[in-house]
Amino acid sequence: MPVTRVEVTPRQGDGMRDVRGDVVRRQLMADHGLSVATVRSICGYLISGETPSSAVASRVDDLFADPIIEHGLTNTMLVTTESFAATPDAVITVGFKPGVTDNPGKAATDGFLTLFPNDDDASIATYLTYVFYGLPQDCDVHWLAGTLHNDLIERALIADRAECEAKTWPELNFPTPPEQVFIEPQAVDLEVD
Protein backbone atom coordinates (compact mmCIF):
# COMPACT_ATOMS: atom_id res chain seq x y z
CA MET A 1 0.00 0.00 0.00
CA PRO A 2 1.28 3.51 -0.71
CA VAL A 3 2.42 5.58 2.28
CA THR A 4 1.77 9.31 2.67
CA ARG A 5 3.87 11.28 5.17
CA VAL A 6 2.35 14.21 7.08
CA GLU A 7 4.51 16.33 9.39
CA VAL A 8 3.30 19.04 11.77
CA THR A 9 5.32 21.52 13.84
CA PRO A 10 4.35 24.47 16.05
CA ARG A 11 4.57 27.86 14.35
CA GLN A 12 7.38 30.18 15.46
CA GLY A 13 7.01 33.87 16.24
CA ASP A 14 5.92 36.31 18.93
CA GLY A 15 3.96 34.51 21.62
CA MET A 16 4.27 31.13 19.87
CA ARG A 17 5.90 28.27 21.77
CA ASP A 18 6.90 24.72 20.98
CA VAL A 19 5.56 23.24 24.21
CA ARG A 20 6.76 19.67 23.46
CA GLY A 21 10.24 20.96 22.71
CA ASP A 22 10.28 23.15 25.83
CA VAL A 23 9.25 20.20 28.02
CA VAL A 24 12.11 18.06 26.63
CA ARG A 25 14.60 20.93 27.09
CA ARG A 26 13.53 21.53 30.70
CA GLN A 27 13.47 17.83 31.52
CA LEU A 28 17.01 17.34 30.16
CA MET A 29 18.18 20.15 32.45
CA ALA A 30 16.28 18.88 35.51
CA ASP A 31 17.14 15.18 35.12
CA HIS A 32 20.63 15.31 33.61
CA GLY A 33 21.95 18.86 34.05
CA LEU A 34 22.14 19.16 30.25
CA SER A 35 21.68 22.72 29.01
CA VAL A 36 20.25 22.96 25.48
CA ALA A 37 19.42 26.32 23.90
CA THR A 38 16.37 25.19 21.91
CA VAL A 39 14.49 21.97 21.20
CA ARG A 40 11.91 21.97 18.41
CA SER A 41 9.46 19.16 17.79
CA ILE A 42 7.81 17.66 14.74
CA CYS A 43 4.85 15.25 14.91
CA GLY A 44 4.88 12.79 12.04
CA TYR A 45 2.12 10.61 10.63
CA LEU A 46 2.74 7.78 8.17
CA ILE A 47 -0.54 6.93 6.42
CA SER A 48 -0.62 3.53 4.77
CA GLY A 49 -3.68 3.59 2.53
CA GLU A 50 -5.11 4.05 -0.93
CA THR A 51 -6.18 7.69 -0.47
CA PRO A 52 -4.09 9.87 -2.82
CA SER A 53 -1.55 12.20 -1.22
CA SER A 54 -3.27 15.18 -2.83
CA ALA A 55 -6.53 14.35 -1.03
CA VAL A 56 -4.67 13.97 2.28
CA ALA A 57 -2.82 17.28 1.70
CA SER A 58 -6.11 19.15 1.34
CA ARG A 59 -7.28 17.88 4.76
CA VAL A 60 -4.06 18.24 6.83
CA ASP A 61 -5.44 21.24 8.73
CA ASP A 62 -8.69 19.37 9.45
CA LEU A 63 -7.16 16.27 11.02
CA PHE A 64 -3.46 16.60 11.84
CA ALA A 65 -2.73 20.29 12.53
CA ASP A 66 -4.29 23.27 14.25
CA PRO A 67 -3.65 25.89 11.53
CA ILE A 68 -3.61 28.76 14.05
CA ILE A 69 -0.64 27.44 16.01
CA GLU A 70 0.81 24.70 13.78
CA HIS A 71 2.19 24.28 10.29
CA GLY A 72 1.72 20.98 8.44
CA LEU A 73 3.02 19.56 5.16
CA THR A 74 2.45 16.39 3.15
CA ASN A 75 5.29 14.24 1.76
CA THR A 76 7.88 16.82 2.83
CA MET A 77 10.17 16.50 5.82
CA LEU A 78 9.76 19.77 7.74
CA VAL A 79 13.42 19.77 8.78
CA THR A 80 14.25 20.44 5.08
CA THR A 81 12.10 23.59 4.94
CA GLU A 82 12.67 27.27 5.78
CA SER A 83 11.03 26.67 9.18
CA PHE A 84 14.27 24.89 10.10
CA ALA A 85 16.71 27.00 8.07
CA ALA A 86 19.41 27.07 10.78
CA THR A 87 21.52 23.89 10.88
CA PRO A 88 20.75 21.95 14.08
CA ASP A 89 23.27 20.14 16.27
CA ALA A 90 21.27 16.89 16.33
CA VAL A 91 18.00 15.47 15.07
CA ILE A 92 16.41 12.43 16.73
CA THR A 93 13.30 10.71 15.38
CA VAL A 94 11.39 8.28 17.63
CA GLY A 95 8.60 5.94 16.53
CA PHE A 96 7.02 2.70 17.63
CA LYS A 97 8.53 -0.64 16.60
CA PRO A 98 6.50 -2.87 14.24
CA GLY A 99 3.72 -4.69 16.08
CA VAL A 100 3.64 -2.31 19.07
CA THR A 101 0.29 -0.62 19.75
CA ASP A 102 0.45 3.01 18.61
CA ASN A 103 -2.44 4.67 20.48
CA PRO A 104 -1.99 8.13 18.85
CA GLY A 105 -1.85 6.31 15.51
CA LYS A 106 -5.10 4.47 16.27
CA ALA A 107 -6.80 7.77 17.18
CA ALA A 108 -5.48 9.37 13.98
CA THR A 109 -6.72 6.36 11.98
CA ASP A 110 -10.23 6.80 13.44
CA GLY A 111 -10.26 10.46 12.40
CA PHE A 112 -8.82 9.60 8.99
CA LEU A 113 -11.54 7.01 8.35
CA THR A 114 -14.18 9.62 9.26
CA LEU A 115 -12.82 11.88 6.50
CA PHE A 116 -12.00 9.07 4.04
CA PRO A 117 -14.50 6.24 4.77
CA ASN A 118 -13.75 4.41 1.51
CA ASP A 119 -10.14 3.73 2.54
CA ASP A 120 -11.17 1.15 5.15
CA ASP A 121 -7.80 -0.69 5.16
CA ALA A 122 -5.87 2.50 5.98
CA SER A 123 -3.72 2.66 9.09
CA ILE A 124 -1.56 5.40 10.57
CA ALA A 125 1.72 5.18 12.47
CA THR A 126 3.06 8.16 14.40
CA TYR A 127 6.53 9.42 15.27
CA LEU A 128 8.15 12.42 16.96
CA THR A 129 11.22 14.24 15.72
CA TYR A 130 13.26 16.40 18.09
CA VAL A 131 15.54 19.06 16.58
CA PHE A 132 18.28 20.28 18.94
CA TYR A 133 20.04 23.66 18.75
CA GLY A 134 22.80 24.72 21.15
CA LEU A 135 23.69 21.19 22.22
CA PRO A 136 26.99 20.94 24.14
CA GLN A 137 29.89 19.69 21.98
CA ASP A 138 30.59 16.75 24.29
CA CYS A 139 26.99 15.46 24.34
CA ASP A 140 26.71 11.88 23.02
CA VAL A 141 23.66 11.87 20.73
CA HIS A 142 23.18 8.12 21.19
CA TRP A 143 22.93 8.67 24.94
CA LEU A 144 20.56 11.58 24.27
CA ALA A 145 18.35 9.37 22.08
CA GLY A 146 18.31 6.79 24.89
CA THR A 147 16.81 9.38 27.25
CA LEU A 148 14.03 10.16 24.75
CA HIS A 149 12.69 6.71 23.97
CA ASN A 150 11.93 3.28 25.42
CA ASP A 151 14.09 0.81 23.49
CA LEU A 152 11.72 -2.09 24.21
CA ILE A 153 8.82 -0.62 22.23
CA GLU A 154 10.30 2.28 20.23
CA ARG A 155 13.00 2.78 17.64
CA ALA A 156 15.10 5.90 17.24
CA LEU A 157 17.01 7.26 14.26
CA ILE A 158 19.73 9.85 14.80
CA ALA A 159 21.45 12.58 12.80
CA ASP A 160 24.53 13.80 14.65
CA ARG A 161 26.34 17.11 14.10
CA ALA A 162 28.15 15.88 10.95
CA GLU A 163 24.99 14.41 9.44
CA CYS A 164 23.10 17.64 10.16
CA GLU A 165 25.84 19.62 8.38
CA ALA A 166 25.46 17.23 5.41
CA LYS A 167 21.66 17.55 5.67
CA THR A 168 21.25 13.80 6.08
CA TRP A 169 18.02 13.57 8.05
CA PRO A 170 16.61 10.51 9.84
CA GLU A 171 13.50 9.19 8.10
CA LEU A 172 11.37 6.43 9.61
CA ASN A 173 9.40 4.13 7.33
CA PHE A 174 5.98 2.66 8.09
CA PRO A 175 6.46 -0.02 10.78
CA THR A 176 5.05 -3.03 8.95
CA PRO A 177 4.93 -5.99 11.36
CA PRO A 178 6.47 -9.22 10.11
CA GLU A 179 4.05 -11.78 8.76
CA GLN A 180 2.98 -14.25 11.42
CA VAL A 181 3.14 -17.89 10.45
CA PHE A 182 0.66 -20.22 12.12
CA ILE A 183 2.15 -23.55 13.16
CA GLU A 184 -0.29 -26.39 13.64
CA PRO A 185 -0.23 -27.68 17.23
CA GLN A 186 1.26 -31.14 17.65
CA ALA A 187 0.45 -33.85 20.15
CA VAL A 188 3.11 -34.56 22.75
CA ASP A 189 3.27 -37.89 24.56
CA LEU A 190 3.48 -37.07 28.27
CA GLU A 191 3.49 -40.71 29.37
CA VAL A 192 6.48 -41.45 31.61
CA ASP A 193 7.76 -45.04 31.99
Q: Which residue stretches match the model-derived regions?
A:
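Core nucleic-acid recognition elements
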Residues: M1-D193
